[in-house]
Amino acid sequence: MAVHRSLLNKPTWCRVAFWWWMLVMVMRIQGTNGKEQDSVIKLPTQEVDAESDEVGTRWAVLVAGSNGYGNYRHQADVCHAYQLLIKGGVKEENIVVFMYDDIATHELNPRPGVIINNPQGPDVYAGVPKDYTGESVTSHNFFAVLLGDKSKVKGGSGKVINSKPEDRIFVYYSDHGGPGVLGMPNMPYLYAMDFIDVLKKKHASGGYKEMVIYVEACESGSIFEGIMPKDLNIYVTTASNAQENSWGTYCPGMYPPPPPEYITCLGDLYSVAWMEDSESHNLKKESVEQQYQSVKQRTSNFEAYAMGSHVMQYGDANMTAEKLYLYHGFDPATVNFPPHNGRLKSKMEVVNQRDAELLFMWQVYQRSNHLPEKKTDILKQIEEIVKHRKHLDGSVELIGVLLYGPEKASSVLRSVRTTGLPLVDDWTCLKSMVRVYETHCGSLTQYGMKHMRAFANICNSGVSETSMEKACVAACGGYHAGLLHPSNTGYSA
């Protein structure tokens, strides 16, 4: 296009106005010649496409199911998710946040009052509402909030998901897990069948149009495997299948590393994968399926499954064609971002969720050289943790021997059911067996959650509660759990 020479002699503001006018005219010409082309660069304030944004109200429940500075990453994940939704236009009044809220001001936090979820990331803590913190972070409150039942909430802000039939709900959970369970900082744990029953009840009440659930936890697939209906208008992805660990990342001593002053992991592999994906794409263009495929690849650590996991899908597969903005909202700053791109193609070093605690403790120990008394105390704590882990592993194995004999014990306890079958046939039995075990052998802890499959298999094989109790007494007689007895920690079932 020729530009008249006289224009070059005009003041700067005139030249800017001319080019602005030309840009508008090009856009109008594109619009009159049919459907607007994706190649046209749009302004953040422009409509992305003709698709209506009338989607009812977007709601979200964000849950960090742990506490303690060693579990920094779970609250960081949830705070990051909150900021992403806010940028997408989801209203604060429609987002319910569960987090213990003990890491931002923790004495070990090198940036007091700040939480980050990426080594170069911004503070994600500022502005996050403290709906349910401390002792109010419970599975009971989570269920009450999701059902919109204020009368059942105990403590906290009282905010609930008061959704209507035309509304959409996004649920995100990050913490430790085990076969059939998700952790909570206050006992009991969240059991899979209880969660599914709540989802069924929410659906029966007509309390939403569609729901998307993301779950970050070890063995998170077991929460839905064989028990998640396909007709609830709910789509689920999980960080792992029913028998895998999930992974912490951005950890000290690993690549990519956190800032050198941090002694704990900043995020979780599946969680940072979906959030960093959402932040780098136009969510009015990217579908649920496209994000699933991207997150699946990254969470597998690009098919390095020894240091990654299989992201799984459950529920209503018909929802995968929907655009993500229906749940995460739309950030106008991403208007010119592609629906998918090749960002973050490199592998990441990770740590097993259950070993992240020991990694953190070891970092504290190594950085306490100038404080010999503290170093001795930390070493003692590490030894106690390892001792209890060995006790948990050994006692469960011995219980199996007492119930099934030495030849069959290991195969029965570790047996994994065929894909499509639930972990256990009788969930009440599972809870009973866990309580019997913890009474005599001590709290399972976030590490011992991995033994839930053994207790489920004990139920599936028809062992009575009386026989289980006798085996637990024989296996754990004389063991003193101390602070790890359920009288101090609470029962996980």
Swiss-Prot record:
It comes from the Eukaryota. Keywords: Disulfide bond, Glycoprotein, Hydrolase, Protease, Signal, Thiol protease, Zymogen. The keyword Hydrolase applies. InterPro entries: AE, Legum_prodom, Legumain_prodom_sf, Peptidase_C13. Residues 1-34 form the signal peptide. Belongs to the peptidase C13 family. This is Vacuolar-processing enzyme. It comes from Phaseolus vulgaris.
